[in-house]
Amino acid sequence: MFQKKTYAVFLILLLMMFTAACSGSKTSAEKKESETEKSSDIAQVKIKDVSYTLPSKYDKSTSDDQLVLKVNVAVKNTGKDPLNVDSMDFTLYQGDTKMSDTDPEDYSEKLQGSTINADKSVEGNLFFVVDKGKQYELNYTPESYGDKKPKSVTFKIDGKDKKILATADKLQDSAKALSAYVDVLLFGKDNADFEKITGANKNEIVNDFNESAKDGYLSASGLSSTYADSKALDNIVNGIKEGLSKNSSIQAKTTSISKDEAIVEATVKPVDASSLSDRIEDKVKDYYSKNSSASYEEAVKYALQVYPEEFKKLGPASSEKTVEVKMKKNDIDQWQLDMDDYRAAELVEAFIKE
């Protein structure tokens, strides 16, 4: 009676739970950045912001302990002739070592080559592979024309500056947010950082989650509330959470960030549900053998009654599954699960192995 359907019901249940729950609030915040400015004989350069970010997933040349220094610059033509500006006009040194420039995940973020007329400006980002917390020098040499070489300008950047280091500390916030969602929704745990990281009201999101879970179970199983009352559904939801919390796990790591999107690599140790349908079926057969006059409705209610305990008995699977999940950032740097992305479903599916 419950064979083949149990697995699909479980997955649809989790998907509906996530869909209803994963919508956080957004508020605006004003950001103010100090500017550093220097001039050559034909150009004025401003460093508007410096931060650490993660290498692009396409950049295979970086080591695991390296980061990317992202420098936002504005260049103004203070000469009389048109000025060509390109990211290649900039070099970065870490000590005496010239560091490699790199491309971001979204190439449009990088300072693009352009020609600007007198008194006009262009702004963009520079990306360099660096070791975190070092001293850097950014050099800008305007493109030369004829025999006269324009003056270069050099900026010193302190990679140990607290403000810059703080950007490195935030690089795993999207991974922490994903783990927090799993904690409070799938595992039924408390997570003290949930609201700070995601911007969602924990009580509201858990209540929405639980109500959606019960509706989702009825919808996916095709059962009416006649068979599954609110108490039975509460027990099923709580049993699933307890079973997942006890016998599954997740390790999350942010692997790339582009603007307001991040890719988090989630390595999931799922529960092994290969025996669940058969075990519930055996329970129902045993029930019928002892209650030969039982109706179909009574048998279904019994199956729903034993479902939570049987689920909690599921052990961890012998293998892990790694999936990529997209997270989206609101305007005050809080990370939320992107339910419009197909990978959210893959994350849910990763928690159970048939």
UniProtKB/Swiss-Prot annotation:
<dbReference type="GO" id="GO:0045121">
    <property type="term" value="C:membrane raft"/>
</dbReference>
<keyword id="KW-0449">Lipoprotein</keyword>
<dbReference type="Pfam" id="PF17118">
    <property type="entry name" value="DUF5105"/>
</dbReference>
<feature type="lipid moiety-binding region" description="N-palmitoyl cysteine">
    <location>
        <position position="22"/>
    </location>
</feature>
<feature type="signal peptide">
    <location>
        <begin position="1"/>
        <end position="21"/>
    </location>
</feature>
<keyword id="KW-1003">Cell membrane</keyword>
<dbReference type="GO" id="GO:0005886">
    <property type="term" value="C:plasma membrane"/>
</dbReference>
<protein>
    <recommendedName>
        <fullName>Uncharacterized lipoprotein YcdA</fullName>
    </recommendedName>
</protein>
<dbReference type="Pfam" id="PF11611">
    <property type="entry name" value="DUF4352"/>
</dbReference>
<dbReference type="InterPro" id="IPR031343">
    <property type="entry name" value="DUF5105"/>
</dbReference>
<keyword id="KW-0732">Signal</keyword>
<keyword id="KW-0564">Palmitate</keyword>
<feature type="lipid moiety-binding region" description="S-diacylglycerol cysteine">
    <location>
        <position position="22"/>
    </location>
</feature>
<keyword id="KW-0472">Membrane</keyword>
<dbReference type="InterPro" id="IPR029051">
    <property type="entry name" value="DUF4352"/>
</dbReference>
<dbReference type="InterPro" id="IPR029050">
    <property type="entry name" value="Immunoprotect_excell_Ig-like"/>
</dbReference>
